[in-house]
Swiss-Prot record:
Any one GO biological process: biotin biosynthetic process
Domain Radical SAM core stretches: 52-277
NCBIfam families xrefs: bioB (TIGR00433)
InterPro entries (alphabetical): Aldolase_TIM, BATS_dom, Biotin_synth/BioAB, Biotin_synthase, Elp3/MiaA/NifB-like_rSAM, rSAM
Protein's name according to its UniProt entry: Biotin synthase
This protein's encoding gene: bioB
Pathway where it operates: Cofactor biosynthesis; biotin biosynthesis; biotin from 7,8-diaminononanoate: step 2/2
Cofactor detail note: Binds 1 [4Fe-4S] cluster. The cluster is coordinated with 3 cysteines and an exchangeable S-adenosyl-L-methionine.
């Protein structure tokens, strides 16, 4: 058994203290023959500190495309030649999407907008949409609408948004290679205000942007410092017309190493499968991740890419004897 896994068994599994950056790097560098043991330990940590339930979430785009930022992985940027163009979703369609999400047993419904940060129009639409969903659908409403001012944070709290997603995307040292129109620190400031407001913080990123293994460990440590309620893990699904459109996808075993490392760095955090798992891991790898530290999934499609049918994921959870977290358990 590698020394890092012996250390993690005592430090993380028994005492609930996450691995630091050096520990995460050691897990990320484990040879293939020790990957099953790392995943097994990560699963034991998840079961010990989070329990057996899996949180299910659906997401929908209130405003798609036309974003002024240059996030190099994103086809919604108005600066690239990708085919996504600006379009708004009407409120009845937003409510219907929430209803369909709730039918899957999901407890979370996240409203997303492709913006640097919300303007007055978006805040009005968001207020109307959140109110309509809360009146008609038994589901928690989350939001992801970019960088916020303190006034906007306060408005979201007043609306009843209980969780806010704002991904750091990658580690601080690599971020300037991925985004140049705003800084990592600006994102961190929004997250600081969200945490202070009492809303739950959802913050993760994308693996496979060109970062090194060392930078993945750096990212895990920075997320652990933030201590978010939830960490969504995406794997790059290269989008035509974007600067990263020709990047290779993450190797499945490297993705699983990352899942184990992030779980061992953050034993109590909701670790959610997000975009890209379909092409990076496939069916078998998706199962392995759920048995290796993952305890939440986004069901259905993502913002600009196709996901798996909700029934496929729900059948897998049933096969693994992993109960879907009930709404009453999240209140």
């Amino acid at each position: 058994m590698p020394e890092i896994l012996d250390q993690a068994r005592t430090q993380v599994l028994e005492n609930g203290v996450g691995l630091d950056e050096a520990g995460a790097l050691a897990v990320l560098n484990l040879p293939d023959e020790h990957l099953p043991a790392a995943l097994q330990l990560a699963h034991e940590v998840r079961m010990r500190w989070c329990g057996p339930e899996v949180e299910v979430e659906g997401i929908v785009s209130l405003k798609t495309g036309g974003c002024p930022e240059d996030c190099h992985f994103c086809s919604q940027s108005g600066l690239f030649t990708s085919p996504v163009r600006a379009v708004w979703l009407d409120i009845p369609s937003l409510v219907e999407a929430a209803k369909q999400t709730a039918k899957t047993g999901a407890t979370e419904f996240c409203i997303v907008a492709a913006v640097r940060g919300p303007d007055d129009r978006l805040m009005r639409q968001l207020r109307e949409g959140v109110a309509a969903i809360r009146a008609e659908v038994d589901i928690h409403v989350a939001a992801s609408v970019g960088m916020l001012t303190q006034e906007q944070v306060d408005e979201l709290v007043e609306m009843g948004v209980h969780r806010y997603n704002h991904n750091l995307e990658t580690c601080r040292s690599y971020f300037p290679n991925v985004v140049t129109t705003h800084s990592w620190e600006e994102r961190w400031e929004t997250l600081r205000m969200v945490r202070a407001s009492g809303m739950e913080v959802c913050c993760g990123g994308i693996l496979g942007l060109g970062e090194t293994v060392e930078q993945r460990a750096e990212f895990a440590a920075q997320l652990a410092e933030l201590d978010p309620h939830e960490v969504p893990l995406n794997f790059l699904n290269p989008r035509p017309g974007t600067p990263l459109g020709d990047r290779p996808v993450v190797e499945g075993k490297d993705a699983l190493r990352a899942i184990a490392a992030f779980r061992l760095a953050m034993p109590r955090t909701i670790l959610r499968y997000a975009g890209g798992r379909e092409i990076t891991l496939g069916d078998l790898g998706t199962r392995s991740g759920l048995l290796g530290g993952i305890n939440a999934v986004i069901v259905g499609n993502y913002l600009t890419t196709l996901g798996r049918p909700a029934t496929t994921d729900l059948e897998l959870l049933d096969d693994l004897k992993m109960p879907v977290k009930a709404l009453s358990a999240t209140l």
